Amino acid sequence: MLKLPETIKMVITDFDGVVTDNCVYINDDFSMSRKLNFKDVMAFSILKKNGYKIGIISGEKNSAIEILAKKFEVEEVHQNIRVKIDVLKDIIEKYNLDENEFVYIGDDVNDIECLNFAKYKITVPHAVDKVKAVAGIQVT
């Protein structure tokens, strides 16, 4: 598991493509489903058990976010956000965090502003190339 710097107090992440497999499944009734990897769900559990606050800033709105946020008592949940940087700045101000106290995890172009703003930035293997060029760390 990735060891975070000791100064980190909060992990702020995108959802689709970071916690999910970056796919949307269309059911017979035209509802949508997402697949979560238990390793990613376990990461939420480990973060909470180690005293980290968690924030989710998602460009989409879906029930998987709400279920996970409730289960792990996620402090900040923001859905259907197209421009994420303002929400990220609001969270940082609310929790009085400096650049050494949070990490941002993203995978797509709408995360680039947040990744550029963050000192500690992480992405995933299937992130778009522009994000990989910005992120400092890629986790599997």
Regions found by a protein language model. Give the residues of each.
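Short acidic, glycine/proline-rich loop/turn micro-motifs
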Residues: 24-26, 68, 134
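Mg2+-dependent phosphoryl-transfer enzymes with acidic/Ser/Thr/Gly-rich catalytic loops
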Residues: 30, 34, 71, 76-77, ...
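Active-site neighborhood of HAD-like aspartate-dependent phosphohydrolases
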Residues: 1-53
